[in-house]
Amino acid sequence: MFIISLTYIKPLEEVDALLEEHVAYLKEQYFLGIFLASGRKVPRDGGIILARAVSREEIETIISLDPFYRHGVAEYAISEFTPTMTSDDLAFLRE
């Protein structure tokens, strides 16, 4: 499991110009079963994505497809973790 933290490095005007493309990218990753949750940080200086994938390399490849990444408007930090405790609703995530 991975936590992907995006931090915007360009003005919000540049981020917003790519938002529709970024949302389409997110929807595709949800459809493929890779992304589990995502949303904006508060304050709005980036976002968080929860994802599952086979490897860090796979996540890095998936991130490289994000319009925010391709256009250089955000930096990405990837943290891998093993969920050992969850609420009952998220039991399917436990390893």
How would you describe each model-predicted region?
Residues 1-95:
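Conserved, structured core segments of small domains
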